[in-house]
């Protein structure tokens, strides 16, 4: 039985006997051509669309966010992409940046279009350290996801060192939970916790002071109890009492004193953040 599917204008048949013979001569192979139609496909590299080149490390600059208010939104988006947070809260935090610290720095790349504003590719925040006038605490370090692993993080940290050293600071502190080896390659070592100063002024705002409970009023000192042993009433004389037995010796075993400073491991830490996640405190002299 012959089954023929007729299509117009060409005829399509599935009968093997009616199939055309294909010659095996290589010189008689059918010729395949691409007929350009409404949409033309070409593999010519000269006609391919140009990809946006990655920014050059040499062209990066570091600028405070409060000096470029037009980039505030872009900086907030960059940080929220790593640590999601209310946009209003993030903008408020960035708006606190000032030359008196805390200070937010942006790593900027020139836009491919010369007339456009630069692109925010990184961010870090610097805060003063309590009781350490020559130290700064580095926080909220982030680089755009598409540019990670290409040297932008190192460029950002090196720029922070230059920025801090030019203003008289000699040590940087930071915390991390998964980038210990990255900071170790930059010269950081494990350190002790420090407290960053949130306010730019040494005096706390009055609104904050009013939030604390007032100190209790002083109470008159209590009279110390008289511990002087009073003489017992004398009774009839008798034989003297025997002396009391000696007190037993206190058997305490003190722990051995370590011969040197406690060893610190890059894999273990005793510190945790507010969420209970282990963190490493690191520091570097600059």
Swiss-Prot record:
Where is this chain's protein located in or outside the cell? Cytoplasm, Cytosol
Query: Which UniProt keyword terms apply here?
Result: Acyltransferase, Cytoplasm, Deafness, Disease variant, Transferase, Tumor suppressor
Question: What reactions does this protein catalyze?
Answer: N-terminal L-aspartyl-L-aspartyl-L-aspartyl-[protein] + acetyl-CoA = N-terminal N-acetyl-L-aspartyl-L-aspartyl-L-aspartyl-[protein] + CoA + H(+); N-terminal L-glutamyl-L-glutamyl-L-glutamyl-[protein] + acetyl-CoA = N-terminal N-acetyl-L-glutamyl-L-glutamyl-L-glutamyl-[protein] + CoA + H(+)
Q: Which residues form the N-acetyltransferase domain?
A: 60-207
**Class of enzymatic activity (EC top level):** transferase
Instruction: Provide the residue positions that the database annotates as binding substrate.
Output: 85, 90-93
Q: What is the effect of changing residue 83 to F?
A: In NAA80mut; abolished acetyltransferase activity
According to the record, the signal peptide region is none
Could you mention a single GO BP entry for this protein?
regulation of actin polymerization or depolymerization
Tissue specificity, per the record, is:
Strongly expressed in heart and skeletal muscle, followed by brain and pancreas, with weak expression in kidney, liver, and lung and no expression in placenta.
Q: What is its EC number?
A: 2.3.1.-
Quick one: which residues bind acetyl-CoA? Answer: 141-143, 149-154, 179
Give the residue ranges for region: Disordered: 33-54, 212-269
The record's annotation in InterPro entries points to: Acyl_CoA_acyltransferase (IPR016181), GNAT_dom (IPR000182), NAA80 (IPR039840)
Primary site of residence:
cytoplasm
Give the Gene Ontology MF terms in alphabetical order. Answer: acetyl-CoA binding; N-acetyltransferase activity; protein-N-terminal amino-acid acetyltransferase activity
Q: Give me the segments passing through the membrane.
A: none
Ranges of Pro residues compositional bias? 236-248
Q: Name one Pfam family in it.
A: Acetyltransf_1
One GO CC term of this entry?
cytoplasm
Function description:
N-alpha-acetyltransferase that specifically mediates the acetylation of the acidic amino terminus of processed forms of beta- and gamma-actin (ACTB and ACTG, respectively). N-terminal acetylation of processed beta- and gamma-actin regulates actin filament depolymerization and elongation. In vivo, preferentially displays N-terminal acetyltransferase activity towards acid N-terminal sequences starting with Asp-Asp-Asp and Glu-Glu-Glu. In vitro, shows high activity towards Met-Asp-Glu-Leu and Met-Asp-Asp-Asp. May act as a tumor suppressor.
Please state the pathology the record ties to this protein: Auroneurodental syndrome: An autosomal recessive syndrome characterized by progressive high-frequency sensorineural hearing loss, craniofacial dysmorphism, developmental delay and mild proximal and axial muscle weakness.
Tell me its family.
Belongs to the acetyltransferase family.
Could you identify this protein by its name?
A: N-alpha-acetyltransferase 80
Q: Which organism is it from?
A: Homo sapiens
UniProt gene name: NAA80
